[in-house]
């Protein structure tokens, strides 16, 4: 008997916004999604703030979204967990952080990370807490290596953050900026080692662009037409010498909490086996605020991983179901590692399909990305009649939305519409069913209605939730859902009991 697959199609960064201006989704031609919405029940679900375990009003992101979707419960995110520990005071007695501070008394403390309150990869409040702790512990030499954002924040907001941290350091009485690098270099995740090398050279070798202050470095970049994301790695100088390069035995605290864009620069700084580029042979006391990758050695983890039992993937495997996880490079970790609750190993019966993302500087240059190739390969896999459950992510609305180009984002959305149409036709033909949704908003909110400025960050808008399949044509959906209700809905569609760890609910009205 042919399998009747249940598919979960995640249109990354595809939110709902009633305003049309600056809304690449509303401005796109989406005949397939329009038709599907007419034929099948659909609603909106929440994908930000408290609904996904983030602080109230905090925009969602892909890591958080996929973790909540796969877990079937609200997962309290590292941002919330760490911020709470600062408020409670536990942060300042954290064993690993204390050890780093003790080591730095004889040496120096380098604090590196994304200078942002975007809350996606890091939070500026965590940096301030580390500086305060250093002062309280008697550390004299504290150097900040700032990575500038411009993706999860306004494209030219780095000066504000730099001033805020400078004011904080002045008030606390310790700390100075040593280097500044755009996240494009310091936080690459696509093995573009030549980018990472520039950030490494600035921090360790004191080689790169030069400036007398972080403000000067940022302003030079703006004058050169480069926004925060693309600030060239720059060494801050004092008396013709770098303010503070990383030296043997220094302590380093990397205050990013999201792993994917923290891994490469960490590997460059700590791994003995490394072939990305030539490095200095130095050993340091290196702290990752959270676990970036279990395979990275020579690091200390300040906030270890939370374990999630019975995620959707694990539970389906226990029930003997086969599954396919499909995405292009940019979102591959999201449909595997994050969807599985931070577990790298595939479940029994879980196959993975990775399509390389195109090698372009920014995705507005190729808004189709690898969606067509991904769709063709996924259609082949559907034809194999071997999968009970399929998760597929289209990266386009998010990755192109981040570029700020509405024109390119429209192409991205229209590409996804075409691809979703093909997949749904095939799934329905097989007698299967599907949920079409998103992990967070982005492409629907690309202009600030008040200032008219380009927005490159995610949004706090709800996302679509469409249930497709012959037996659901006249079904009713519950309102007020959230991402953690998706897994229980899928189990409902697969006629499986929900495990007790899942606190979400099926959104199909009984």
Curated annotation (Swiss-Prot):
<dbReference type="GO" id="GO:0006007">
    <property type="term" value="P:glucose catabolic process"/>
</dbReference>
<feature type="binding site">
    <location>
        <position position="331"/>
    </location>
    <ligand>
        <name>substrate</name>
    </ligand>
</feature>
<dbReference type="Pfam" id="PF01676">
    <property type="entry name" value="Metalloenzyme"/>
</dbReference>
<comment type="function">
    <text>Catalyzes the interconversion of 2-phosphoglycerate and 3-phosphoglycerate.</text>
</comment>
<dbReference type="Pfam" id="PF06415">
    <property type="entry name" value="iPGM_N"/>
</dbReference>
<feature type="binding site">
    <location>
        <position position="62"/>
    </location>
    <ligand>
        <name>Mn(2+) 2</name>
    </ligand>
</feature>
<comment type="similarity">
    <text>Belongs to the BPG-independent phosphoglycerate mutase family.</text>
</comment>
<feature type="binding site">
    <location>
        <position position="12"/>
    </location>
    <ligand>
        <name>Mn(2+) 2</name>
    </ligand>
</feature>
<dbReference type="GO" id="GO:0005829">
    <property type="term" value="C:cytosol"/>
</dbReference>
<feature type="binding site">
    <location>
        <position position="439"/>
    </location>
    <ligand>
        <name>Mn(2+) 2</name>
    </ligand>
</feature>
<comment type="pathway">
    <text>Carbohydrate degradation; glycolysis; pyruvate from D-glyceraldehyde 3-phosphate: step 3/5.</text>
</comment>
<feature type="binding site">
    <location>
        <position position="183"/>
    </location>
    <ligand>
        <name>substrate</name>
    </ligand>
</feature>
<feature type="binding site">
    <location>
        <position position="189"/>
    </location>
    <ligand>
        <name>substrate</name>
    </ligand>
</feature>
<feature type="binding site">
    <location>
        <position position="458"/>
    </location>
    <ligand>
        <name>Mn(2+) 1</name>
    </ligand>
</feature>
<feature type="binding site">
    <location>
        <position position="121"/>
    </location>
    <ligand>
        <name>substrate</name>
    </ligand>
</feature>
<feature type="binding site">
    <location>
        <position position="440"/>
    </location>
    <ligand>
        <name>Mn(2+) 2</name>
    </ligand>
</feature>
<dbReference type="InterPro" id="IPR036646">
    <property type="entry name" value="PGAM_B_sf"/>
</dbReference>
<feature type="binding site">
    <location>
        <begin position="258"/>
        <end position="261"/>
    </location>
    <ligand>
        <name>substrate</name>
    </ligand>
</feature>
<keyword id="KW-0324">Glycolysis</keyword>
<dbReference type="InterPro" id="IPR006124">
    <property type="entry name" value="Metalloenzyme"/>
</dbReference>
<feature type="active site" description="Phosphoserine intermediate">
    <location>
        <position position="62"/>
    </location>
</feature>
<dbReference type="GO" id="GO:0004619">
    <property type="term" value="F:phosphoglycerate mutase activity"/>
</dbReference>
<dbReference type="InterPro" id="IPR017850">
    <property type="entry name" value="Alkaline_phosphatase_core_sf"/>
</dbReference>
<keyword id="KW-0464">Manganese</keyword>
<protein>
    <recommendedName>
        <fullName>2,3-bisphosphoglycerate-independent phosphoglycerate mutase</fullName>
        <ecNumber>5.4.2.12</ecNumber>
    </recommendedName>
</protein>
<keyword id="KW-0479">Metal-binding</keyword>
<dbReference type="InterPro" id="IPR005995">
    <property type="entry name" value="Pgm_bpd_ind"/>
</dbReference>
<keyword id="KW-0413">Isomerase</keyword>
<feature type="binding site">
    <location>
        <position position="402"/>
    </location>
    <ligand>
        <name>Mn(2+) 1</name>
    </ligand>
</feature>
<dbReference type="InterPro" id="IPR011258">
    <property type="entry name" value="BPG-indep_PGM_N"/>
</dbReference>
<dbReference type="GO" id="GO:0030145">
    <property type="term" value="F:manganese ion binding"/>
</dbReference>
<dbReference type="GO" id="GO:0006096">
    <property type="term" value="P:glycolytic process"/>
</dbReference>
<feature type="binding site">
    <location>
        <begin position="151"/>
        <end position="152"/>
    </location>
    <ligand>
        <name>substrate</name>
    </ligand>
</feature>
<feature type="binding site">
    <location>
        <position position="398"/>
    </location>
    <ligand>
        <name>Mn(2+) 1</name>
    </ligand>
</feature>
<comment type="subunit">
    <text>Monomer.</text>
</comment>
